[in-house]
Amino acid sequence: MGRTTKVGSAGRFGPRYGLKIRRRVAAVEARMKQKHVCPVCGRKAVRRISTGIWQCQKCGATFAGGAYLPTTPAGKVAKRVTASKA
């Protein structure tokens, strides 16, 4: 196993790809693995099931979102536009 103190979960790549890339991967994975707010019940219990599929552990709501985060910047813009038109 490689040294992981600097890059955490990206230590699995060993010395490959450079430190900057591995730090970036570790930051994305850390944000992905934390619990997120459910759009249905509002609880902080949403976990990623697979790429782009998210599920709330509390209410069981399953929805599509971004690959690494349940809401993407483009999704936020689209939601804001549809809310202003309604």
UniProtKB/Swiss-Prot annotation:
Disulfide partners: none
Zinc finger (C4-type): 38-59
Keywords: Metal-binding, Ribonucleoprotein, Ribosomal protein, RNA-binding, Zinc, Zinc-finger
Cofactor needs: Zn(2+)
Cofactor: binding details: Binds 1 zinc ion per subunit.
Example GO biological process: translation
Gene Ontology MF, one: structural constituent of ribosome
Superkingdom of origin organism: Archaea
Listed Pfam families: Ribosomal_L37ae
Subunit structure, interactors included: Part of the 50S ribosomal subunit.
Cross-referenced PANTHER family: 60S RIBOSOMAL PROTEIN L37A, LARGE RIBOSOMAL SUBUNIT PROTEIN EL43
Protein name, as recorded: Large ribosomal subunit protein eL43
Source species: Thermococcus kodakarensis (strain ATCC BAA-918 / JCM 12380 / KOD1)
Gene that this polypeptide is encoded by: rpl37ae
